[in-house]
Amino acid sequence: MTAWIKLISESDATGTLRDMYEQAQTPHGTVDNVMKAHSLRPHTMQGHIALYRSVLHHPDITLPLWFLEVIASYTSIKNNCSYSLTHHFMNARRLLNDEERADNIYAALLEGCPERAFSGKELAFLIYAAKLTLDVGDMEKRDVDLLHEAGCSDGEILEVNQVTAYFNYSNRLLNGLGVTTEGDAVGYYKASGEETS
């Protein structure tokens, strides 16, 4: 079972849904279950695709993409969303292209101890993402002041804020509908040496 509600397959998609599936294709040429979860209301997929691509795949992003994938993964850990963690830590791992470092980061995040793998502004961003995820009602100006003190620019803060906010949305979509990775090609990026479709 890939979800607790009906998901319309790519082969059964017609009209607007078929068009949305074409827009949602990954570099693997597949449509992940996170997008298929919208299949009964394809208009909601359009907004999801636009938001996802704007926070993780836009050319004006300044922070390293591997690190934004780490933010996505840490947010997903805090929300206990195995779907997003599976996909997005695979992305971080492929972008890092350093298995030992990726393993160390993954262990530190799972243990809730990002300071074991990060320092400086990267650590400050992870602390911010965790608080925004778990204690959103307690956010205050001081949280942003701490990011400034760590050397983060306002634009970088916005990038991390948007990735964290997006994954809080996506994690709730996935966990709330019981969406699994069954049938997905895990990760957005091809593995080193893997041919693009």
Which sequence ranges carry the predicted segments?
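Hydrophobic alpha-helical segments
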Residues: M1-S197
